[in-house]
Amino acid sequence: MTEAMKNVFSRPLDIGYMIRNAPPALDHVLPGLLAETVGLVVGPGAVSKTMLALQMGIAMATGTPLLGGLVGGISGRPQKPERVVLVLAEEAADVVWQRLHAIMSVQLAALEIDPELAAELLEKNLGIHALAGSDQVNLLGDNWDKTPAGDLLRRACEGARLVVLDPVRDFHNADENDSTAMKALARHIASYAK
């Protein structure tokens, strides 16, 4: 180990303070997904996980109800447009273009949002990187360390409230059954969320 381990046991939680004071409100990005954490959407291929990610991204970027209101608001606060970055390793730009139009014509049209306002909000708040046919963005080095690609990803996602890597399998070359490698990958991704 090249650097000394930080003593993670030097500052236990202040139980007295916690008991005597109300806890802060939890900051949810999506229901069940706290800010600065990592979550997974898992399922077999071709069940529309990417379309779900696009719909979530569009809703957050425009401040419109998530999935047309099927998913309730969080903490009763009004929704505001938020920056979202989608990194789609298996999607070509033309496919994303088709899907954006499909979502705009159904999801946003049903909410009666002005199309020009929606376009402006999406242009400002939604970053999509369609990487099909591009070089792999490998976030896990040979010794499970961070990579230069991870630093580029972190910079591309600065200020984003939600970042989606789809599918996560395309962002590393490790054996997904290797728990050490997957733990390192999860820690790297979590560090980008800070």
Question: What are these language model-derived features?
Answer:
Residues 16, 75-176:
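Conserved inter-motif catalytic segment of the P-loop NTP-binding fold
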Residues 3-105:
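The Walker A/P-loop phosphate-binding site
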Residues 23, 143-146, 182:
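A conditional alpha-helix N-cap/helix-loop micro-motif detector
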